[in-house]
C-alpha cells in the first residue's frame, strides 16, 4: 500500500497529524521498502539497518515528503516549507531562539588585561583599572609595589606610585572626569582643570557684556559706566574668601541673595601663569603675612608651587559638598521650571500720577496780599453780580465750586476739563501696560541671572572636585612614602609634629609647612 492511499484510508478513524509525523520520521530514517511497516498504526515501530543504496531512498523520501506537505497545507500554500522545517529533524534551526546567538555575545564588550602573565577579562574599564592598581601595581606597605609598566610591549619606568597609576590610564579606556557644562570626559583631573579655563573665559566675557544686573534690579543704576565695568573686571571678593565666609553660613539652596553674591565672585584664573597676573586686593590682603613670621616660624620648601584657590582637608570637602548640593537643587528647579522669586521685600510701586481737573491757575483775587491790595479791574468782573473777598472756601481751594471770581477764560477751561474727564483713565491704562512690560523684563533678568549662576556653580563644583582628587592623590603618595596604613595615623603623626611631642626629623612633611622651634 502506498503512503498516499494509506493516509486517505486512515483519515476518518485516526489522527492525521500523528500519521504525518510517523511518515516524516520513516522517510528520513528508512528506505522506501519499509514504508508500509512504519506507517501502519497497528505494527510497532522498527529501525532496520540502513542499506547501501542511500541515494535512491533519499530521493524517494524527499518526493513523498513533498507530496505529504502539499496534502497537509494545500498545493498553493506558502507555508509548505515551514511545515517541513518544523519537523523534529529541523530542531537545529530553533537554536537561535532558545540560546543566545553570536551577535548577542558580541554586544558585550570585554576589556582584557594585557599585563604580563595575566589574561583576565572585565566588563567595564573601571574594574580593569582597579585590578591593575591593586593586583599588578600593588603598594609599598604591602611590599609588592611595581613601578615598571608591563602592559604588552610598554616599557615605561616610573619612580612613584601615582606616576604609574596615572600612566595606566593611557592603556585603559577610562575617562571618569566629566565636565558638567559640555559633558566632555577626561582621564585625569589635571586635564579637566585645563578644560575648565575655556568655560571660565566664556563666562567672564558674558558677565562683561551683560553688566551689573543686581544694581539694575534694585533701581540703583549708575551713570558712570566705567565704574560699573571696573566692578566686574576687578571683583571685590575671591573664591577663597567666598568659601570661607559664605559656605559656612549659607544653605545649599538657590536664592536671589546668593546669586547676587556669586555674580561678583572671582572664578578661576584666566591666565595659566598666575605669577604674571597682578593679584587682586582681596587676595593680597588675605595672603599678607609678616616677614618675621615667615622667616622664624615657617619654612616653605616649594616657593614656585602654584597656590591653590581654596583650602585643604575638611574645608575643601565641605565646599565640594556645598556646591554639589547647590547644583542638584538648581538642576531640580531647572527641570521643574520653578525659579524662586526674589526675597528682597516688597518693591515700591510708584503711585499713578493724579492729573488735576482744571489748570493750576489761581484767580487774581486769590493771590497773597502783600502790601497794598491790587486794584480790581472791571473787565474781569463784568459778569459778577456780587464782589466777594477771598477766603478759605474760595474757588482756589475748592475747584468744583464755580465762584464769580473766575474770568471768562478760566470758566472756559473748566468746561473743557469736565468734557475730557476720561483722559486720566486712558493714562492709567498706559501706565499699567508699562508696569506689565517692566515686570516681564524683570522676569527675564531673573531667568538670565539663574542661568548665569547655574553655570558658575557647575564650573566651581568641577574645579573643587579636581582639587580634592589631586589632594587625595598627594595624600596617597605621602602615605606610601611614610608607610602609613590609615588617614588617622597620618593625622595623629602630623599633630604630634606640630605640637612638638616628637622630633620633626623622624618624619618629613614635604607638602606641609614645618614648624621650627
UniProtKB/Swiss-Prot annotation:
List residue spans of C2H2-type Zn fingers.
Answer: 111-136, 147-171, 177-199
| InterPro entries, per the entry | pacC/RIM101, Znf_C2H2_sf, Znf_C2H2_type
Query: Spans of biased composition, class Low complexity?
Result: 40-64
Keyword Secreted attached: no
Q: Where in the cell is it found?
A: Cytoplasm; Nucleus
> By its UniProt entry, which Gene3D superfamilies does this protein fall under?
Classic Zinc Finger
PROSITE patterns, per database record = ZINC_FINGER_C2H2_1, ZINC_FINGER_C2H2_2
GO MF terms here are: DNA binding; zinc ion binding
Residues spanning the membrane: none
Instruction: List UniProt keywords, sorted A-Z.
Output: Activator, Cytoplasm, DNA-binding, Metal-binding, Nucleus, Repeat, Repressor, Transcription, Transcription regulation, Zinc, Zinc-finger
Biological function = Transcription factor that mediates regulation of both acid- and alkaline-expressed genes in response to ambient pH. At alkaline ambient pH, activates transcription of alkaline-expressed genes (including RIM101 itself) and represses transcription of acid-expressed genes.
* Family classification: Belongs to the pacC/RIM101 family.
Q: State the protein's name.
A: pH-response transcription factor pacC/RIM101
Q: Which organism is it from?
A: Kluyveromyces lactis (strain ATCC 8585 / CBS 2359 / DSM 70799 / NBRC 1267 / NRRL Y-1140 / WM37)
Please name the taxonomic classification of the source.
Eukaryota, Fungi, Dikarya, Ascomycota, Saccharomycotina
Amino acid at each position: 500500500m502506498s503512503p498516499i492511499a494509506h493516509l486517505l484510508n486512515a483519515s476518518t478513524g485516526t489522527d492525521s497529524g500523528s500519521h504525518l509525523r510517523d511518515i516524516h520520521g520513516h522517510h528520513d530514517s528508512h528506505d522506501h521498502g519499509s514504508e508500509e511497516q512504519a506507517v501502519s498504526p497497528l505494527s510497532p515501530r522498527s529501525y532496520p539497518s540502513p542499506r547501501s543504496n542511500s541515494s535512491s531512498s533519499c530521493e524517494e523520501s524527499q518526493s513523498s515528503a513533498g507530496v505529504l506537505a502539499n496534502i497537509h497545507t494545500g498545493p498553493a500554500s506558502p507555508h509548505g516549507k515551514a511545515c517541513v522545517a518544523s519537523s523534529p529533524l529541523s530542531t537545529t534551526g530553533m537554536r537561535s531562539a532558545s540560546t543566545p546567538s553570536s551577535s548577542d555575545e558580541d554586544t558585550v564588550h570585554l576589556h582584557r588585561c594585557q599585563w604580563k602573565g595575566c589574561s583576565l577579562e572585565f566588563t567595564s574599564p573601571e574594574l580593569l583599572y582597579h585590578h591593575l592598581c591593586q593586583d599588578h601595581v600593588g603598594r609599598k606597605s604591602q611590599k609588592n609595589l611595581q613601578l615598571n609598566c608591563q602592559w604588552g610591549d610598554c616599557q615605561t619606568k616610573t619612580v612613584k606610585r601615582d606616576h604609574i597609576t596615572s600612566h595606566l590610564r593611557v592603556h585603559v579606556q577610562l575617562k571618569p572626569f566629566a565636565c558638567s557644562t559640555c559633558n566632555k570626559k577626561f582621564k585625569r583631573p589635571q586635564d579637566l582643570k585645563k578644560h575648565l579655563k575655556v568655560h571660565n573665559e566664556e563666562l567672564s566675557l558674558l558677565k562683561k557684556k551683560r553688566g551689573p544686573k543686581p544694581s539694575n534690579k534694585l533701581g540703583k543704576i549708575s551713570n558712570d559706566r566705567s565704574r560699573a565695568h571696573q566692578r566686574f573686571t576687578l571683583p571685590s571678593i575671591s573664591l577663597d574668601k567666598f568659601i570661607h565666609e559664605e559656605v559656612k553660613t549659607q544653605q545649599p539652596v538657590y536664592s536671589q541673595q546668593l546669586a547676587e553674591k556669586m555674580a561678583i565672585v572671582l572664578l578661576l584664573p584666566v591666565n595659566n601663569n598666575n605669577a604674571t597676573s597682578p593679584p587682586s586686593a582681596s587676595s593680597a590682603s588675605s595672603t599678607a603675612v609678616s616677614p618675621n613670621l615667615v622667616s622664624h616660624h615657617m619654612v616653605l620648601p616649594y616657593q614656585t608651587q602654584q597656590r591653590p584657590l581654596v583650602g585643604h582637608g575638611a574645608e575643601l570637602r565641605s565646599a565640594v559638598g556645598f556646591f554639589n548640593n547647590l547644583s542638584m537643587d538648581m538642576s531640580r528647579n531647572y527641570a521643574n521650571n520653578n525659579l524662586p522669586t526674589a526675597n528682597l521685600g516688597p518693591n515700591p510701586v510708584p503711585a499713578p500720577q493724579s492729573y488735576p481737573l482744571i489748570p493750576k491757575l489761581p484767580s487774581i483775587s486769590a493771590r497773597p496780599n502783600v502790601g497794598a491790595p491790587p486794584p480790581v479791574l472791571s473787565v474781569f468782573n463784568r459778569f459778577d453780580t456780587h464782589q466777594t473777598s477771598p477766603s478759605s472756601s474760595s474757588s482756589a481751594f475748592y475747584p468744583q465750586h464755580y465762584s464769580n471770581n473766575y474770568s471768562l477764560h478760566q470758566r472756559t477751561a473748566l468746561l473743557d476739563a469736565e468734557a475730557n474727564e476720561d483722559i486720566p483713565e486712558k493714562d492709567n491704562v498706559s501706565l499699567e501696560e508699562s508696569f506689565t512690560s517692566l515686570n516681564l523684563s524683570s522676569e527675564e533678568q531673573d531667568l538670565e541671572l539663574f542661568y548665569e549662576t547655574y553655570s558658575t556653580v557647575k564650573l566651581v563644583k568641577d574645579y573643587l572636585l579636581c582639587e580634592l582628587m589631586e589632594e587625595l592623590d598627594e595624600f596617597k603618595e605621602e602615605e606610601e612614602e611614610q608607610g602609613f596604613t590609615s588617614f588617622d595615623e597620618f593625622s595623629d603623626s602630623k599633630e604630634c609634629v606640630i605640637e612638638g611631642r616628637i622630633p620633626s626629623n623622624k618624619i618629613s612633611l614635604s607638602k606641609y609647612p614645618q614648624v621650627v622651634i
